[in-house]
């Protein structure tokens, strides 16, 4: 009986679906284990072989935990909102919902063929109203909350309104956009609109003026990671910096908790460090500077308070509100020209680019420690969102300030004894302070730092600043609030209407607010987002429903928000929704949340380190504050799978001809390498006829072969349609089967490493499965396994495998597991193993890797339940102990022969036995050995 993978895989996929094999419910009698993949965006291209890598890795682990007796949740869904479907709608007129559903159906078909243990009963799609109901609900909760710094948690905004009415904001310690000061009397005298504007300063979801990446052609704001080299990642359209009123989430309020939480999760050190750097905590000092000949003052933040005496100029971010205030008439044209240039660069590009650019504002600031007037410059190396958007420049001790000072010929004053700043800045925080103040200058203040260490000088300056009302000590974070608006159609609508220009939430009992139909998916002619085309997009407060726009009276019927939510909105709490996806009353029930708690294993790419993995942690912490999520951290263990790169093939066309020369002959001609479809190449040998049929221009191609074959060149590149190196998993499944695909993807290398796809090795994995099959079936279709006692050798082989595979799965070293399977099968084949107990354990071990194959043989062994419900075998160390040990017998360090000894033989027995052996006597030749050296369990060396 041959291994017929097509019949087997079809049979078991159907059986799993009919029996709901992977459907799971809360079971208090079992320990839970929650496995989750970062769910895919369903693109039109479908899956290539790189996409399932992480899914296969997590599926192996999920199956393994189920075999260990855990109740395993392993769901799948779709991150269904996104730009590609909307762009396709703009080009074709086809509604994004249709495109998305078609793409999802294609993805589902491909995923099913690979044999994943997903509980499809829990599938979520972020574009469905039943799902985004809870995205809208969470947004409303954020709008109706503020962040209390004293208790370090979100609290109801109603607490603030009550406190303001009684005490004003005296003593309030809350996260805010700007620091305000007002009394209860002043608050109570304000209009409703004025009060709402003040509350907006504290809400966790708020409207704020922010600098954004604006793409005119796409008509929307883009996140930093959607912009590359000043153009949009999608379409390559120009992107500029623009100030807009946008919905924002006060992620910055959670900065310290986001940092602290990293100490409680099992993530890689590199990913944790990436997040720590992104959050960017720094302890420092805020200092007030006065503008010369003006009443204007501004604040800077510095972590190097010891360097105040070395400030030789100030720098403002181009977006700073101080720029128009401090720009003199004489400098106005030059400044405006500079601002136009900087608008074309994203913050990320500005951080990465070390080129020096800037312009003088025309104004000067007074250094409060020296009394000197220092010039105020404008430069894009200063960012508006970090600190105060203004810096004091100390070129002697900061590399970017140093480069700026050198470029514009500004003074450089060293502040550390013995430091040389003739070629570069001295950035080390070590040494003895000098020139603070300079000896040749009359002191302006009564502070002297000379002779102190840098650490002592920082502390002394902080005390001086506080004592003389020059500023305050402060902790800053680089982490910004998240911009939460997009000027697109295909996204979650905001459950918001506008009254007197201020936002109000629709009643939560009326959620979800569904996305309306529009005639066009582009912005309106007046520049409004695509929802501006909707004719039925107004909110009737009394009826609690959406009505026609022409009914708007701004009394009971109001306009609805025209922006939609960004891509990360739907993915920020999907792990919670999987716990209870059909609950119409809550995001997740208390029972489900308390049972599943959080994700035990999360698998996805490192590209989400500073996006999704920050936002989802913030979102979960907020829901934890509300008592919705029992765990503060959503993902306990995170594994980042590497990328499967493409292995491109090349043909070599002789210049000015349609003749192609084989790889090893190409140096004899002047050739041009051309990418060729890898699907018509096998083991680097081109299917010449398929190539001629591939493209019309190659129909009459001629070939110069070697040994009757056309050998292609190859290179490892990104898997891309333009390089013709995309491999469709459907083709691999059709040719070799899903179990071969699963095992081969794991065999390519460690899960976390990137590696090239190379079909040249897939035959070996397929042959392994055939060889294993032969342990169960003879060539005459006889079923071979029988009952009986296993031999010592069989027990040793299988328990060695149990130990190896168990350890490898725990560490995601799947590639070495598969090597171990191959070794074990070779050993069992040599032993002519027919033992049912041994072979049953072998199949259980294989089940996570090759589930269809394992199910078929498990059933053949007489089992009536799924192999998924078998018990993972425990290894017995006793079976791995060696009864005998092979010693190498050496004479004067040269190995001559080997001898076997009992594992517990003592040195005296070993020496006596060796010396009496005929082979030893031959090499001793009657001499008396000087000494005998025995290395336990390895070598006996006789020194003559």
Swiss-Prot record:
Residues annotated to bind ATP: 721
Span(s) of short sequence motif 'HIGH' region: 40-51
GO biological-process terms attached to the record: leucyl-tRNA aminoacylation
Motif stretch ('KMSKS' region): 718-722
Main location: cytoplasm
Keywords: Aminoacyl-tRNA synthetase, ATP-binding, Cytoplasm, Ligase, Nucleotide-binding, Protein biosynthesis
Descriptive protein name: Leucine--tRNA ligase
Organism per entry: Phocaeicola vulgatus (strain ATCC 8482 / DSM 1447 / JCM 5826 / CCUG 4940 / NBRC 14291 / NCTC 11154)
Lineage, top ranks: Bacteria, Pseudomonadati, Bacteroidota, Bacteroidia, Bacteroidales
């Amino acid at each position: 009986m041959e291994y017929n993978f097509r019949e087997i895989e079809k049979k078991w996929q159907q059986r799993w679906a009919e029996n709901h094999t992977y459907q799971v419910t809360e079971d208090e009698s079992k320990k839970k284990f929650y496995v989750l993949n970062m769910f895919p965006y369903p693109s039109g291209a479908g899956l290539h072989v790189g996409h399932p890598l992480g899914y296969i890795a997590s599926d192996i682990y999920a199956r393994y935990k189920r075999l260990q007796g855990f109740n395993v949740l392993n769901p799948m869904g779709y991150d269904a909102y996104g730009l590609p479907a909307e762009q396709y709608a703009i080009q074709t007129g086809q509604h994004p919902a249709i495109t998305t559903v078609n793409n999802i159906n294609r993805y589902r078909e491909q995923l099913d063929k690979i044999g994943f243990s997903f509980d499809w009963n829990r599938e979520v799609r972020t574009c469905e109203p039943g799902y985004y109901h809870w995205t809208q609900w969470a947004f409303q909760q954020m709008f109706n909350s503020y962040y209390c710094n004293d208790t370090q948690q979100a609290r109801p905004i109603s607490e603030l309104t009550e406190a303001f009415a009684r005490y004003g904001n005296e003593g309030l310690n809350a996260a805010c956009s700007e620091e305000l000061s007002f009394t209860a009397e002043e608050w109570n005298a304000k209009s409703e609109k004025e009060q709402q504007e003040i509350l907006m300063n504290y809400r966790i979801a708020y409207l704020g003026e922010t600098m954004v990446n604006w793409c005119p052609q796409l008509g929307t704001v883009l996140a930093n990671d959607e912009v590359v080299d000043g153009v949009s990642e999608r379409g390559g359209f120009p992107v500029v910096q623009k100030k807009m009123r946008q919905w924002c989430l006060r992620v910055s309020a959670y900065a310290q908790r986001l940092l602290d939480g990293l100490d409680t999760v099992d993530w890689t050190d590199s990913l944790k460090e990436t997040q720590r750097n992104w959050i960017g905590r720094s302890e420092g000092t805020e200092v007030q500077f006065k503008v010369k000949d003006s009443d204007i003052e501004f604040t800077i933040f510095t972590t190097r308070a010891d360097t105040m005496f070395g400030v030789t100029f100030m720098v403002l971010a181009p977006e700073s509100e101080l720029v128009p205030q401090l720009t003199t008439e004489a400098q106005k044209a030059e400044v405006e020209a500079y601002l136009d240039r900087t608008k074309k660069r994203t913050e990320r590009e500005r951080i990465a680019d070390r080129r020096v650019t800037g312009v003088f504002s025309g104004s000067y600031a007074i250094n409060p420690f020296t009394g000197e007037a220092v010039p105020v410059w404008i430069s894009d190396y200063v960012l508006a969102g970090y600190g105060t958007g203004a810096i004091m420049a100390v070129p002697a001790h900061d590399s970017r300030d140093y480069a700026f000072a050198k470029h514009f010929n500004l003074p450089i004053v060293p502040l550390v004894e013995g430091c040389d700043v003739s070629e570069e800045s001295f950035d080390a925080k070590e040494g003895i302070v000098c020139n603070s103040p300079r000896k040749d200058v009359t002191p302006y203040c009564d502070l002297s730092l000379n002779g102190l260490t840098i650490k002592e000088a920082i502390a002394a300056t902080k005390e001086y600043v506080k004592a003389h009302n020059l500023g305050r000590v402060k902790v800053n974070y680089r982490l910004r609030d998240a911009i939460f608006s997009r000027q697109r159609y295909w996204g979650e609508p905001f459950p918001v209407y506008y009254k007197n220009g201020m936002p109000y939430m629709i009643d939560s009992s009326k959620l979800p607010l569904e996305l309306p139909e529009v005639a066009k998916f582009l912005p309106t002619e007046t520049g409004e987002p695509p929802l501006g085309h909707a004719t039925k997009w107004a909110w009737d407060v009394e009826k609690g429903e959406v009505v026609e726009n022409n009914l708007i009276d701004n009394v009971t019927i109001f306009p609805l928000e025209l922006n939609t939510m960004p891509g990360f909105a739907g993915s920020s709490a999907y792990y919670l929704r999987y716990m209870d996806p059909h609950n119409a009353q809550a995001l997740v029930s208390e029972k489900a949340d308390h049972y599943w708690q959080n994700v035990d294993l999360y698998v996805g790419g490192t590209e989400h380190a500073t996006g999704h993995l920050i936002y989802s942690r913030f979102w979960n912490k907020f829901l934890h504050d509300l008592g919705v999520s029992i765990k503060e951290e959503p993902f306990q263990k995170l594994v980042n799978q590497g990328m499967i790169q493409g292995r491109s093939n090349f043909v070599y066309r002789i210049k000015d001809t349609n003749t192609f020369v084989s790889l090893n002959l190409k140096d004899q001609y002047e050739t041009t390498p051309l990418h060729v479809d890898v699907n018509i190449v096998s083991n680097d040998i081109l299917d010449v006829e398929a190539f001629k049929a591939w493209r019309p221009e190659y129909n009459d191609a001629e070939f110069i072969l070697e040994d009757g074959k056309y050998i292609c060149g190859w290179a490892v590149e990104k898997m891309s349609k333009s390089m013709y190196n995309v491999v469709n998993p459907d083709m691999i499944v059709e040719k070799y089967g899903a179990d071969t695909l699963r095992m081969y993807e794991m065999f390519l290398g460690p899960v976390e490493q990137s590696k090239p796809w190379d079909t040249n090795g897939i035959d070996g994995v397929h042959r392994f499965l055939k060889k294993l099959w032969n342990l169960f079936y003879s060539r005459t279709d006889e079923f071979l396994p029988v009952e009986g006692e296993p031999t010592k050798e069989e027990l040793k082989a299988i328990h060695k495998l149990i130990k190896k595979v168990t350890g490898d799965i725990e560490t995601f070293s799947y590639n070495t597991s598969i090597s171990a399977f191959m070794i074990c099968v070779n050993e069992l084949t040599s032993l002519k193993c027919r033992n049912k107990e041994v072979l049953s354990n072998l199949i259980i071990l294989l089940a996570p890797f090759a589930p269809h194959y394992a199910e078929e043989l498990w059933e053949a062994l007489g089992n009536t339940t799924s192999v998924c419900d078998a018990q993972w075998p425990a290894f017995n160390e006793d079976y791995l102990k060696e009864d005998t040990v092979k010693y190498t017998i050496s004479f004067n360090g040269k190995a001559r022969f080997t001898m076997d000894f009992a594992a517990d033989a003592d040195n005296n027995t070993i020496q006596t036995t060796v010396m009496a052996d005929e082979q030893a006597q031959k090499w001793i030749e009657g001499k008396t050995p000087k000494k005998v050296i025995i290395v336990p369990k390895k070598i006996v060396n006789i020194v003559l």
